[in-house]
Amino acid sequence: MYIIKRANSSARGFTLTELLVALVINVLVLSSLLAIFIANLNHYTTAINTNRLNQQLQSAMQLMTSDIRRAGYWANAKTSISTDTNSNPFMATGTDVSVGGTGNNCILFTYDKNSNGTLPSISTTADDERYGYRLMNGALQTRPWGASFSCTAAAASWENVTDPTITLTALTFTERTQTVTTGLGTSSLTTRSIDISMTGELTSNTAITKTLTEHVRIRNDKFNP
């Protein structure tokens, strides 16, 4: 005699429909997790790139401000003023602070770096105490020893300061002056300052951009006898 037992319903397993529903749910969960991961990764990458751009621009700005601040320094300035003259070779025509270039994107200046009181001839073998910064082809450039002391110097004759990973889109120098009397006859002092505005972007992502501004007070006032 055959005995037929009813199969336990709990041992039947999942139906095809139930498996498909479970699979869809798993796919949706994994897709959500993947989307969150990608969003976090993009945010992290953007933060790193923004920080990189900021560091590059800050370094470039600090280099310019610390250098421009010294413009016109002359070791013998006290002696010149005591004789009511201004024979400062670092404030003469052609060596004094000068802003030029396209849209005032270039600055030239000199200072007595070695404090020997004289401005040397242009030389490629030693610091000739002539300095400059400008925007050229998306990069900040500085004038090296022996190069043309001109805002229109060939691009290859000056050196790039900024890294190729960033592109400068704007650089402007604005000179501001104020003349005050000294109370000694007709002599006066001219105070000078330079306002710098610089904008840059990531070369690989032009949507990431930043603008820095700085006010630089030139420490060496110009004596007008």
Regions found by a protein language model. Give the residues of each.
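Aliphatic-rich helix starts adjacent to a transmembrane/signal segment
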Residues: 2, 12-75
